[in-house]
Amino acid sequence: MLKKFFLPDEFVKNIFHITPEKLKERNVKGIITDLDNTLVEWDRPNATPRLIEWFEEMKEHGIKVTIVSNNNERRVKLFSEPLGIPFIYKARKPMGKAFNRAVRNMELKKEDCVVIGDQLLTDVLGGNRNGYHTILVVPVASSDGFITRFNRQVERRILSALKRKGHIQWEE
């Protein structure tokens, strides 16, 4: 059960290791990505210049991006709107409704999309439960909000169990 729900299909150090070329090899046309601690630190209000370049590179290669966050409208809107990136706030991940809405809004199929995030309990679990290819990234910041701190404790136990069973080879 752990493997089925919590094992990501891929693990990368950060969002910048996900390139259009690698996505095109898998025929990916759309990205559903978390915001906080995936794209930027949870308390950073806007995108870094490097992240802006990453978004532009995806767009140039015809890969659509939608930000799907459990955070509130104000936070997600203030980050996403200046970039022209579609977003869904209060997503209630790991529930699948927001993932599926993002796919519909991008006018793609589930098979054409990947889910990217920094949390097993929201991003990976939600993506896996709903049949998406999942990519786990190392959190951008070492600090978290209150609820996420609790989730991280649970995630450490899950990662440890997956590692013990030989399902993962990366270092935490």
UniProtKB/Swiss-Prot annotation:
The keyword Hydrolase applies. CDD domains: HAD_BsYqeG-like. GO terms for molecular function: phosphatase activity; phosphatidylglycerophosphatase activity. The keyword Hydrolase applies. One of its GO terms (cellular component) is cytoplasm. Has low dephosphorylation activity on GMP and glucose-6-phosphate. This is Probable phosphatase YqeG. It comes from Bacillus subtilis (strain 168). The lineage of its organism: Bacteria, Bacillati, Bacillota, Bacilli, Bacillales.
